[in-house]
Amino acid sequence: VYIRFDYLCLIFETLNIKITTLMLQKTFLARCDNRACLAKTNIMSGSPEAWLSNDLLSKSNTFGLTFDFFVDWAINQISPYVWIKRILLPTYTYDEFIGKLDSEMEKEFGKDYLCRLGRFATEYDMQIQFIVFHDELDWSNDRNELLIVSLSFKEGCYSFSPQKYSLSGFKELIKSHSGGPVSIGSKGLIYGTSRLECSLSKTDSLYPGDADLLLLNEDNKAVCILEFKKHTLSSPISEQCFTNYYPRPDGRKYKRLALLRDYLASKSNSRILFFVLYYPTQTYIEQQWKLEVIEGNAFSLRATDSFIFELPADKSDNEYKKVIEKISQVIAARS
């Protein structure tokens, strides 16, 4: 049955049901050469992003942040900029978004999340910036524009400062934060979270990598970095281990995360843990996930312990809570 959207709105208005229209949407992982081809996921259990959502984490006085961050590779140190990206829907202009900036940011992220981000930035001496862009644009054209919205946080209140950048200016900003040009080769990424990221992966202004999840405690202190490692093959999850990927082919990725761990630890004078969580996308192999504890300095990392658990039997909150409990137990044993 097809119902016109304006008729649907009239029905909702008559029933006093409010429709919240969002200008922003999250980026998503898909093939760079075909954005309709999404990355594989486990259809029975879902993904760690769902298992460890803030709706569930908050019930155990824990909070998670996901963001992109920079390493200045000229000095092997963290550049204090946190980027959080969002796509602006094509029906809205940048100026329309700026005109409703406060309300749209609050609708997308929530006031509590924004306050936590602000406190985190203050505690760890970092600048939070939101990268907002029209992803349908031709990102090979250096004249195309995007928006950077900087978050300020003073005396418990946040505010936003937007600034438009041309793609050429954005590339220079990436190089500045990265300690110079940075690339992965002319072929670029196979999978990316946006057309923008995919396009930049073929240049010497590579979009920064991410922290899949940084866990904060009830005092907003960083506790643990979690890297999610998707297993798409048919081999047992028990065969997934750190030495499969470190020091090659993913040494730089893990070095980045270890440098972030060390930066945060130095700012808070506390120990921060580093885990890799392996999970399968295939449903015909044994349904388990694996957690490895990673230790050592950023230039010489190693796995010191590992644990294997049953995957969530379904996509229910009760099953996901079991994952949170297992991770919390491993953290508690090492705190």
Regions found by a protein language model. Give the residues of each.
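Acidic, metal/cofactor-coordinating or nucleic-acid-engaging core segments within structured domains
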Residues: 109-112, 185-206, 234-282
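Acidic-basic catalytic patches of nuclease active cores, encompassing PD-(D/E)XK
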Residues: 19-76, 120-126, 133-209, 330-335
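Active-site or metal-binding loop neighborhoods of secreted/extracellular toxin and effector enzymes
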Residues: 143-169, 286-335
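Structural alpha-beta junctions
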Residues: 62, 75-79, 109-129, 153-160, ...
